[in-house]
Amino acid sequence: MNATILVKIITPLSIALEKQAKMVTMSGEEGMFGVLPSHVPMIVSLKAGLVQVYIDDMHKSENTYLISGGVTEVTANYINIATDTAINVTNLSEAEIATKLLDLQKTLSDQH
C-alpha cells in the first residue's frame, strides 16, 4: 500500500512540519488515536503530548513532535494540526522528552 496523507503542524510563527506520511498518532481529549490515509473527516481537540508521524509502512522512520495541545482537522487527504507550540523531539531520548513534556505542562499551567 503506497497511500500517504499530507501532515502539517502549524504554529503561530511557522509551519513546523509539512510531510507525506503513512500514519499519524496523537493525543486527543479522549485518548490517543491514529490517522491513516482516507480517514473519515473529523475535527478533534488535542491535549499536550506527542504527535508521531510515521513515514514508512514498517513504522520505523518517524518524526516526533511535542505539542502544547491544539486542534486537528482530518480529511481523507490531509491532517492539519494547529498548536501554539511544536518542539521537534525526534532525536531525543525518552527521558529528555519526558523532561520537555513536564516543562511544557508547567508553562501551560502557569499561564492559567
From Swiss-Prot:
The species this protein was found in: Rickettsia peacockii (strain Rustic)
Quaternary data: F-type ATPases have 2 components, CF(1) - the catalytic core - and CF(0) - the membrane proton channel. CF(1) has five subunits: alpha(3), beta(3), gamma(1), delta(1), epsilon(1). CF(0) has three main subunits: a, b and c.
Disulfide bonds: none
Function: Produces ATP from ADP in the presence of a proton gradient across the membrane.
Keyword Nuclease on entry: no
Record's protein name: ATP synthase epsilon chain
Gene Ontology molecular functions: ATP binding; proton-transporting ATP synthase activity, rotational mechanism
Protein origin, superkingdom: Bacteria
InterPro entries: ATP_synth_F1_dsu/esu (IPR001469), ATP_synth_F1_dsu/esu_N (IPR020546), ATPsynth_dsu/esu_N (IPR036771)
Keyword Signal in record: no
Membrane topology designation: Peripheral membrane protein
Localization, UniProt: Cell inner membrane
Principal location listed in the UniProt entry: membrane
